[in-house]
Structure formats: structure tokens, C-alpha cells
Amino acid sequence: MRKVKPARKLGRTAAHRKATLSNLSTQLLVYKRIETTEAKAKETRRVVEKIITKARKGTVHAQREIFKDIRDKQAIRILFEEIVAKVGTRQGGYTRVIKLAPRFGDAAKMAVIELVDYQEAPSASQKTGKQDRAKRVKGSKKTAEAAVSVAG
């Protein structure tokens, strides 16, 4: 009797799905945090958790096994030099999926997937970025009106 495998197909062929998950995994290892759809984030979490667990072994065989999934030498280097050192003795749960608001164009469920040990608090410039921009826009509007009134 046919049994259903517990993986999401993501509406793709097997080769396309493998390539998509490989690319998402590579980007997650390089950038530590990516925004994607919720289904892709959850599938990427399954792949990345297994990759990091293999990497913790640190053997040549583990490197070769990981290189099957991630064909990027920079991502492999980051994985073995930075991420494995950072996760230390953590027994799993290396990633976190945070749900976001739906995407504007098609209302797809969006999520952020990030590595747990790479939380960075937003800097002061990031926190006030929108406020500064609003002030500049308001200020530029006033200066534009003043220039029109002087010219007119």
C-alpha cells in the first residue's frame, strides 16, 4: 500500500524542489536570516537542521555529505568555521521560523527563517530610519513649497 511521505512538494518537480531548497539553505547559511513563504521556510528548516547536525561531526565524510546538498564553497566554509562553533553543544533547534504578514501582491503567507544563535538587536540607525526619512520628506516638501512661493 502506498504511503505518503511527510514532505511538502511546494508545487514543483523533484529536481526543482531540490534546487530551491538547496538555494534557500545556502542563503540562510550565508546571510543568517532570510524572508520567504511559510511553506518554503518550514521545508528549509528541515534541511538546514540536518545539515548543521552533520557539520557538528566535523569529519571529511560529513563535509562530502553536506556538499551534496549545498554546492557553495563559501557557505560550506561559513558553516564549518562560524556556525558550528557558535551552536556548540546545542542538541538541535538551530533555526527559528517567525510568521509575518501576508505578501502584498498575492497574499501568500510569509515568514522569516533565521539561525537562532545569530540574533542581532537593531542598531540606533535602523530603529530611527523610517522616522528620519519621514522628517526629510516633510522637510523637503516645505522647502519645495517655499521655493515655489518665492519664485511665484
From Swiss-Prot:
This is Large ribosomal subunit protein bL17. NCBIfam families: L17 (TIGR00059). It comes from Pelodictyon phaeoclathratiforme (strain DSM 5477 / BU-1). The keyword Ribosomal protein applies. Residues 121-140 are annotated as: Disordered. The keyword rRNA-binding does not apply. One of its GO terms (cellular component) is cytosolic large ribosomal subunit. Belongs to the bacterial ribosomal protein bL17 family. GO terms for molecular function: structural constituent of ribosome. The gene is rplQ. One of its GO terms (biological process) is translation. Keywords: Ribonucleoprotein, Ribosomal protein. It holds the Pfam family Ribosomal_L17. InterPro entries: Ribosomal_bL17, Ribosomal_bL17_CS, Ribosomal_bL17_sf. Part of the 50S ribosomal subunit. Contacts protein L32.
